[in-house]
A protein has these predicted regions:
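A short beta-strand motif characteristic of beta-propeller blades
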Residues: 112-120, 155-168, 203-216, 264-270, ...
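Asp-box/WD-like beta-propeller blade repeats and closely related beta-sheet repeat scaffolds
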Residues: 163-164, 168-181, 187-195, 199-227
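Beta-propeller blade signature
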Residues: 248-260, 302-313, 356-363
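Blade-level signature of beta-propeller repeat domains, shared across WD40, Kelch, NHL, RCC1
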Residues: 392-400, 404-425
């Protein structure tokens, strides 16, 4: 791999979750993010109002007329329908977001496991999140929007299923949401703050500054994931930095714990390893999955510098419970099903920059790791419900389910883009 390609990969790899495939990294760095594909309020769609946060903790810095903790005007772009919809509303199993790294689309999965023929267009780098009833599309760096959608109206109403859409500061890069009743915390990976918004209208209710946790010279600690449990908000920070030659430095990750109601900082805990990817609360205990540093092949080594950490909040300590030696490398993504977690292990990338990954099933309490055969690229994300695992396998490309014994490939509609993100209701 030549020096320019190495620089391109290193430049963007640190800006997103470790699970992103190198193909997307090359495209976004070389071409720039397309910010014109997000939804907006036009015609007879819901009208969106600008709003600001009057909370004392809100940011006072300004960028293009918006504070870094504010939700601004509706995006100037629009949702596009790829085909007409029927007039029958349906209950859904979940949604799948597809991307070819230049365009992105949202499709939905009905109770029979069929993916919709119709789709809505969004920014090519987006994440779908649900709270069990509503759907949210986080359009990431380059579009920087949050869109709430009524899933029951998707099939019958198409783009009119949009309830509201709000625009964030440029390059705020929303990456996750954690729901707290009729409000939700939003992680902004490239900003110096977290915001709490109303799920009714998207208006900011609270903002907390996190820039003090950034690595020296950086403005953001680069939040990778957030989790809300029993009144506490767990904020996972990667805290990397990059020099002018695109060389990335990863210090050990940091877990910050906030009061989910007030936004007050309760504690911080230094992790044992670097480049964390996911945080989860399992059986009252906090666990963190870490990817660690990349090796020369842009994969990860099977060593003790990465794995699954168990965090002892009361003692402010973290221990490496299951190492990369047991897993075969670093964790790109993790989903939880009771005491069992499924993790995708980053092994590297092929000559076409497609991810090469291994899928592992981990029994947390027994510290037992098992291989799940037949999956080679989970960079289209994973989701799980009642023991049924959904994998966005971009090597197929399709959404593939696994019930612990048998795989089933969900048929892709003609022209559907490869899976990039999955969320279940």
């Amino acid at each position: 791999m030549n020096k320019m390609k190495k620089n391109v990969i290193a430049s963007v790899a640190k800006q997103s979750f470790a699970a992103l495939s190198i193909a997307s990294l090359v495209f976004m760095t070389a071409c720039g993010d397309d910010s014109s594909s997000g939804p907006s309020s036009t015609g007879d769609e819901p009208e969106l109002s600008s709003s600001s946060n009057d909370d004392e903790g809100s940011s006072s810095s300004k960028k293009k007329g918006k504070s870094s903790s504010s939700v601004g005007e509706a995006s100037s772009s629009s949702v596009e329908e790829s085909s007409s919809s029927s007039e029958i509303s349906v209950s859904l199993t979940g949604v799948v977001f597809g991307s070819d790294y230049s365009t992105g689309e949202l499709r939905w999965i009905d109770k029979d496991g069929k993916i919709s023929e119709s789709s809505l267009s969004f920014h090519q780098d987006s994440k779908v999140v649900t709270n069990g009833a509503d759907l949210y599309v986080l359009e990431r760096k380059g579009a920087d929007n949050i869109t709430k959608i009524d899933p029951e109206k998707l099939e019958s109403k198409g783009k009119k299923a949009v309830v509201w859409q709000v625009s964030l500061d440029d390059e705020a890069n929303p990456v996750d949401m954690a729901f707290d009743g009729d409000q939700a915390w939003v992680a902004l990976q490239n900003a110096d703050s977290l915001v709490k918004i109303s799920t009714e209208d998207g208006k900011v209710k609270k903002s907390i500054k996190i820039g003090k946790f950034a690595y020296e010279g950086e403005h953001s600690p680069y939040v990778a994931d957030i989790e809300l449990d029993d009144g506490s908000l767990y904020v996972l920070m990667q805290r990397y930095t990059q020099d002018e030659n695109y060389v990335v430095t990863y210090p050990k990750g940091l877990l910050a714990i906030y009061d989910a109601s007030t936004g007050d900082l309760k504690d911080t805990i230094q992790l044992k390893s670097k480049n964390p990817s996911n945080v989860a609360v399992i059986g009252g205990n906090v666990y963190v999955a870490t990817h660690g540093e990349y090796n020369a092949a842009y994969g990860t080594d099977a060593d003790s510098q990465r794995g699954i950490e168990k965090v002892n909040v009361s003692k402010k300590k973290s221990e490496l419970l299951i190492s990369g030696e047991d897993l075969g490398g670093g964790i790109a993504s993790m989903v939880v099903d009771g005491e069992v977690v499924y993790v995708s292990i980053n092994l590297g990338y092929d000559e076409n920059y497609a991810a090469i990954q291994a899928l592992k099933k981990v029994d947390i309490s027994a510290k037992k790791v098992d291989d799940v055969e037949g999956f080679t690229d989970m960079s289209g994300s994973m989701a799980i419900d009642d023991g049924l695992l959904y994998v966005g396998d971009r090597s197929v490309p399709a959404v593939v389910t696994w019930n612990g014994k048998k795989k089933n490939t969900i048929k892709q509609p003609k022209g559907a883009l490869p899976p990039y993100n999955i969320a279940l209701f």
